[in-house]
């Protein structure tokens, strides 16, 4: 942005560059301004950090909207990536836990089968003893 001021036969050009755009306070913007004072006898350059309450230029508005669009997208992408990684870890833990439960279940099934077979044999032995005691 360029502003032209005429003061006491001196022509000064002020180049204003946005230094920082505050997302919280959008009415006042901080600019870095460089003032070039030109006269026939001397050339002078002044730099200062000033605050202007002017309406921002199109470039400043564009930069503001771009920063507001990029930052949430990036943070949203990072947040989604972290949540996906967290979900993957939870899924992996649940998978391992399920595999352990399945193995334990198989062991218990084998044990139940052996106990059932033992119960059958004991029951058949009991039946044979009852039959032999009845026949005596």
UniProtKB/Swiss-Prot annotation:
**Keyword vocabulary terms for this entry:** Coiled coil, Transcription, Transcription regulation
Could you tell me in which tissues this protein is expressed? Expressed in the adaxial epidermis of the cotyledons and in the vascular cylinder of wild-type torpedo stage embryos.
**Induction or repression:** Up-regulated in response to increased HD-ZIPIII activity. Up-regulated by REV.
Q: Name one GO biological process term.
A: leaf shaping
Q: Which domain of life is it from?
A: Eukaryota
Q: Which residues form a coiled coil?
A: 97-122
Does the keyword field hold Acetylation? no
Function according to Swiss-Prot or TrEMBL: Competitive inhibitor of the HD-ZIPIII transcription factors in shoot apical meristem (SAM) development. Acts by forming non-functional heterodimers. Part of a negative feedback loop. Essential for proper functioning of stem cells in the SAM.
Q: How does it assemble?
A: Interacts with REV.
Q: Which PANTHER family match?
A: PROTEIN LITTLE ZIPPER 1, PROTEIN LITTLE ZIPPER 4
- What's this protein's name? Protein LITTLE ZIPPER 1
Q: Which organism is it from?
A: Arabidopsis thaliana (Mouse-ear cress)
């Amino acid at each position: 942005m360029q502003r032209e001021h005429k003061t006491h036969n001196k022509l000064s050009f002020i180049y204003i560059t946005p230094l920082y755009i505050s997302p919280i306070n959008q009415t006042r913007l901080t600019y870095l301004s460089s003032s070039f004072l030109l006269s026939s006898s001397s050339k002078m350059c002044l730099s200062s950090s000033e605050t202007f309450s002017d309406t921002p230029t199109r470039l400043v508005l564009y930069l503001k909207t771009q920063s507001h669009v990029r930052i949430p997208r990036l943070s949203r992408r990072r947040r989604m990536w972290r949540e996906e990684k967290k979900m993957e870890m939870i899924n992996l833990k649940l998978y391992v836990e399920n595999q352990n439960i399945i193995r334990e279940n198989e062991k218990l099934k084998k044990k139940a089968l052996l106990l059932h077979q033992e119960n059958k044999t004991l029951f058949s032995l009991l039946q044979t003893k009852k039959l032999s005691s009845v026949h005596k």
